[in-house]
Amino acid sequence: MAIATSAQLARALYDNTAESPQELSFRRGDVLRVLQREGAGGLDGWCLCSLHGQQGIVPANRVKLLPAGPAPKPSLCPASPTQPGSSCPTPERGCEEQEVYVIPPPARPCSASGLPARSCSPSSDSIYKVPRGNGMQLTASRDVAEVYDVPPNILRAPSSCPYDSPASFSCPVAPVVPQPPREDEAPYDVPLALKPPAELERDPEWEGGREPGPPLYAAPSNLKRASALLNLYEAPEELLANGESRDADEGIYDVPLLGPEPPSPEPPVASSSTDLDTVAQLPTRSSPPQHRPRLPSTESLSRRPLPALPVSEAPAPSPAPSPAPGRKGSIQDRPLPPPPPCLPGYGGLKPEGDPECREVANDPAGPHNEYEGIPMAEEYDYVHLKGVDTAQGSRPLDKAFPVDPELLERGLAERKEALSPEEPLVLSTGDLQLLHFYAGQCQSHYSALQAAVAALVASTQANQPPCLFVPHGKRVVVAAHRLVFVGDTLGRLAASAALRAQVGAAGTMLAQTLRATVLAVKGAALGYPSDTAVQEMARCVAELAGQALRFTTLLDGLLP
């Protein structure tokens, strides 16, 4: 059977497994060359094809004939025999029949008359077709049998680096002159302030009439142009309008201090006058009052130094150095005042053998706190209402008042007339404000104490059980404790030493009487129905009312 060569191709539609030696095995998608079509040699339903150099019959329903390609047209631009680059050799038909894969012939581009021709056929030894580099021609020294077409490295220099990294670009980089840090450079990152117009006119970069070259780093334009439209930060118009009158180093940002400043060489005696001079010089160093901007927030008020309050008495020994000397006039930074002396009208001194006096006397540094030396258990003994009365015999008690409410009010009125300050104190404005505020509070607290004392006395006269008179006793304790708190706060905040002494002594006596009253109420509740315990409670309550009246009258009398 003669086989007629044909260039017809067919594509496999399904997989096929050979069932006889004359049948071909193929997979779906394989391209077969058709040697004889269906029915040509008396083979109905079979085609004679070749695949991978083998010939055999193939079921006609499992392949699909591909349309034949157009016949190659002759080249319109014949290549010159003198130009080897424009020659396009055509592969022979015999080579086509012996190839394993069917590869379409390469394109045949026409070479322009004025352009150098390029070779359109790949190298005979190359396995894969890869695009050529842009504008790169193969040199004669290059290996012809190279598998991959890889462009040479650009500007590659011989180096011992084991890694193949691209060469650096040849773009020039502007040199950066290293600038040493200035001595007065602040550690905080604060934006620069606007330059005045006078400095902008003298800028050498702008005098030549041309802008300087592009800088290496982008900077906001408002640093060189004092314009409100290009301003990156919101600032008051007064600062922009009066930029020339401000200091060069003065900014609109509030930067906190880094640490303590060196102590002033001036003696501590002249601290008050120095602070007053500093306060007087503040308006002269700052901008005019009509152009001063508002504070950014109320938080800045706490960072501004407060002036020291004038003290007419002899100066006390200088305390330990404050961590921030710039705020030595602040109320929060002043040390606590010394303990107030015991005045004749409010009680005598403690005996020599008292452990608290010995502890204060042995301290070489002197008393630093008015609460030092007071044991914590004794200080809050009246709150816990438990334990044995340990402080009952420490101080002699005054004569007890009668239990009758009328006699009690009459005695309180007599004491109020007797307690009038002999000499009015010269107080500062701050002390007067404190007195006005706390004197009004003491009036309301004393009224609540009077109502609670009257209810407690009426309950004891009716011989009521502890479940009824103990709540009245608690009301008495709470009202008196508020008065003690007022005295303690006023004694710490007042600037006058005489005022602190008087208020502190009266508050101390009131606190001791309150502690004795708490213990008496507790004893009356535990010893009910003992008449002795009830009488002791009534006596302590009357004494507490007298001390509260004494304290309230003292604050009223100190007011002008």
UniProtKB/Swiss-Prot annotation:
Chain residue ranges for the region called Disordered: 176-219, 241-372
Modifications the protein undergoes after translation, according to the UniProt entry: Phosphorylated on multiple tyrosine residues. Phosphorylated on tyrosines by FYN and SRC.
Stated role: Docking protein which plays a central coordinating role for tyrosine-kinase-based signaling related to cell adhesion. May serve as an activator of SRC and a downstream effector. Interacts with the SH3 domain of FYN and with CRK, SRC, and YES.
Residue list for modification Phosphotyrosine: 253
Pfam families: CAS_C (PF12026), SH3_9 (PF14604)
Compositional bias per record (Low complexity), positions renumbered to this chain: 305-315
Name of the protein: Embryonal Fyn-associated substrate
Record domain SH3: where: 5-68
Motif (SH3-binding): 304-310, 334-340
Record remark: domains: Contains a central domain (substrate domain) containing multiple potential SH2-binding sites and a C-terminal domain containing a divergent helix-loop-helix (HLH) motif. The SH2-binding sites putatively bind CRK, NCK and ABL SH2 domains.
Tissue-specific expression: Widely expressed. Higher levels found in placenta and embryo. Lower levels found in brain, brainstem, muscle and lung. No expression in liver and intestine.
Record field: compositional bias (Basic and acidic residues): 198-210, 351-361
GO molecular function terms noted in the UniProt entry: SH3 domain binding
Gene Ontology BP, a term: cell adhesion
Bias-annotated ranges (Pro residues): 259-268
Keyword annotations of the record: Cell adhesion, Phosphoprotein, SH3 domain, SH3-binding
Location of region: Divergent helix-loop-helix motif: 437-487
Keyword Membrane (UniProt): no
